[in-house]
């Protein structure tokens, strides 16, 4: 499971998720990727479930790159605890994913295998996603479907 080794502050503000992702919008490592169409928090358990779904389908072929990391903590109070008396204890870790961010990449497999593996991974995530290919021309838009 992905968790930070150490953090400066255990309890963070929730923050806003306005606009698009600033970086990580292009495929850098593999040939195919899974792009977020909407913004959302993705928990470390969801990332792990998506990774397992992809690697199980691909068996021993290809390579998977995870481009997001859960570095934000979220807090929760216990069930039946009354309001007030401070912020709750850290309950887990999330990755803040904005629209346009490439979350997972796959390389070394055919397009059909990559498409199905990323579809299985997207079923484990709480957001809408789309399958993207690395553009063949450098600096140009891909004109294939």
Swiss-Prot record:
Keyword entries, A-Z: Ribonucleoprotein, Ribosomal protein, RNA-binding, rRNA-binding, tRNA-binding
GO molecular function annotations of the record: rRNA binding; structural constituent of ribosome; tRNA binding
Keyword Ribonucleoprotein carried by entry: yes
GO biological process, one term: translation
Annotated GO CC locations: cytosolic large ribosomal subunit
Keyword Ribosomal protein: yes
Stated role: Binds 23S rRNA and is also seen to make contacts with the A and possibly P site tRNAs.
Entry's family note: Belongs to the universal ribosomal protein uL16 family.
Subunit text: Part of the 50S ribosomal subunit.
Alphabetized NCBIfam families for the sequence: rplP_bact (TIGR01164)
Family annotation (HAMAP family): Ribosomal_uL16
Name the record gives this protein: Large ribosomal subunit protein uL16
Naturally occurring in which organism (per UniProt): Lactobacillus johnsonii (strain CNCM I-12250 / La1 / NCC 533)
